[in-house]
């Protein structure tokens, strides 16, 4: 872990990206809380001097005070003096950077305050103390500790949950990092609402009323703005410089070949054989061969496109240095990042990374493919040739990560000056694509001033807050009509059998009839049939969809059913005159048991009042009353009357669980629709909207107006209604 990668410096980066107004509001809010070291006057002269030196360019002049001398880079000399800016005598203007030390000081105070109040950390508090105010002091103190004590401190902070073997530097880094995270989180909770809203506007996040959720969102967004020092270090280490010198090429013994031997085909009709020879395609004379190429950067004339192809003395290829281009999309050439050049007719190709890519230039330019990646610091002679090869399949293994010894760039440009810039740009793009750093999650939201419970950095992830406090679980019961539609489409009946699918739905009192069980007897035929049983209002109806579509036969069969029902009278589901196979009888019992999920064991409702209670007193001992046992709960959720009418629970029962989740998990849509019908509430086809209607009705006590149109009657129901209207008209 490098010395510059102090967690405080990394974590303070997002604060520097906030607006000056937000930082000013934060400092003012901290001043109102009277946290130590939060006033502008507390900014020491040394901190002001450091800020001024950071803003001062390297070439600015400095003054001498007390015999102190400074270099041109504003660094102190060995005599231990101090430096001052030329403008130090002018009145100090508070700018954005002056607020950062104040905020950082408060964060450290909160960090150490949290550190010394961790449960069971008396020994750790004695080791660290409470007077440390700078990040370097904690690092220095931790390095003095015995390895055993350091490990004990690391364990007390809860940072060893998933770490088996970790060195001392990593332990110290994680301790500092966790402290800073805790400090920032506690500071956010002490800021006022106005400051937090300003933070949200700068970070472009949604303002929330929940304080914990708002601070967690700010922490998550600020973490994403942190920049890892590893990225800049790698980029600086892998930057190449192009130099052009007029010298004789080095001896052949110091070069290695990296040319692939794959057979290549040019974009023109010319075919390049799989040999070490190269084909030159240029419109003007290239640069003389006496100009060597440094750091594997190709330099060409204004209208010449050249690819570096180093060869050894024997003219053979080095097998260990062979590189395969990456696979491009069929018909679409893969473009590498390039820098805009002045308007010329020569192509500019720039390839970044270790694995070379294929770039196709406009039709008037020559197509160039970069296929070499020599090691760093190997000087290869420039060749006046252009290698054109089609894209081949990418290697099965992924390309290795960029390192200091392997990260080189091969660039083909038109001028020497632009080559260096393009090379640096391409390598910076390559390094930014690498993983940023290890994840560090947010902290637990504090419910009070008690210390937070730390967990392991790098292994945690922020947990998103639920949008709704009521967690709605998916309905486990089958939705009405869903089983029949699905089974009817997937059934595969044989020529001599009939496929039967059973679906359970809630009864509706509007279409209840006296018959308890009706069955359409199907004759075995060679035609395919699909039969669907639907339980509605306690009465089984069989709906047949015959391929011939004979509606008259269905009407005749339905009339026969009614005559049979009239002769048999009201019957129980358990005793039916239908002759069916044993599997259908078993399904009958299953359907009867399904009612027990909603009903009670008697017909009087166990104290629940309904519209038909007065009429049901004489029918309590009737043998035709169905007995449905409640298996899910001892509480009454509704029941059926003797005429198969479903009675929904009363208001008192629903008020027990007025939450949306209670209605969602314990009632089907048909239950809720029946409830809406009894209390003259609007009906809706979706369960969510129906629940909302019921909840609004229970809270307000008034039923909204009916907006839906009355259902249009069809078939026998329409004829019956018409007959009743005629009779009423005749009687009047």
UniProtKB/Swiss-Prot annotation:
Name under which the protein is recorded: Uncharacterized protein DDB_G0290587
Record field: compositional bias (Acidic residues): 553-566, 610-621
Biased composition (Polar residues): 57-76
Compositionally biased region (Basic residues): 327-338
Region (Disordered): 38-90, 226-629
Compositionally biased tracts (Low complexity): 47-56, 77-89, 231-247, 254-318, 339-383, 401-421, 487-523, 567-577, 593-609
Superkingdom of origin organism: Eukaryota
Lineage: Eukaryota, Amoebozoa, Evosea, Eumycetozoa, Dictyostelia
